[in-house]
A protein has these predicted regions:
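N-terminal, charge-rich interaction modules
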Residues: 2-58, 159-168
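Short, surface-exposed beta-edge/turn micro-motifs
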Residues: 22-25, 80-83, 108-111
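Short, flexible beta-strand-to-coil junctions
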Residues: 29-35, 88-91, 115-120
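Surface-exposed flexible segments
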Residues: 36-51, 98-105, 125-129
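Short, intrinsically disordered low-complexity segments
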Residues: 53-94
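Short, low-order "capping/linker" segments at domain edges
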Residues: 73-81, 122-152, 167-168
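Extended, charge-rich low-complexity interaction segments
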Residues: 90-103, 146-168
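Short, compact, well-ordered microdomains
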Residues: 94-119
Length: 168
């Protein structure tokens, strides 16, 4: 049986890194920049329930930063939000990605980050979520590999004051 301290240590950067190395993990958030703090907190709780409802193991809560684009003005703002790191559990790659993308769509997210094997992929969950390139909507792009201890201009994730980002 684990002690309480051992239980608390489980949700650390090294644990997330080991799950990342095994493959089959995703980062998703229920927060939106246009919602109040209270609404975002309620959405994060509901997202936690929805993750378990999709048959995925419980998520590790982290703090994330992301550039969010306003649909009306087209203005980009840096948003700090509560994110969830989810592993695939017993789900296959396709079913896992599908479940995570559907959750991203439900919560109106621009995109979700999924990782199978070594590289992470950022997939749009709504039209125009990742902007346009050469006049066409971007559906997905490769984020690179997980780099613990680094931060990125596009966005990064933090757990217990330790940061990680995806870089090529």
């Amino acid at each position: 049986m684990k002690t309480f301290k051992e239980f608390l240590e489980e949700s650390s950067l090294s644990r997330i890194k080991s799950k990342s190395d095994k493959g089959g993990m995703a980062v998703i958030s229920g927060s939106r920049g246009d919602k109040s703090k209270k609404e975002n907190k309620a959405r994060a709780k509901q997202l936690d329930r929805d993750i378990k409802g999709k048959g995925l193991p419980g998520a590790t809560k982290v703090s994330g930063r992301w550039d969010e684009k306003d649909d009306d003005t087209g203005k980009t703002t840096k948003v700090k939000e509560r994110s969830h790191v989810v592993t695939s559990g017993k789900k296959g790659k396709r079913a896992f990605k599908k479940a995570v993308k559907s959750l991203g769509k439900k919560y109106g997210q621009d995109a979700v980050l999924t990782q199978t094997k070594k590289t992470g992929t950022v997939s749009a969950t709504r039209k125009g979520g990742l902007g346009k390139q050469a006049g066409k909507n971007v559906k997905r792009f490769t984020a690179g590999t997980m780099k613990p201890g680094r931060s990125s201009a596009e966005g990064d994730t933090q757990i217990k004051k330790k940061t990680f980002a995806y870089k090529k």
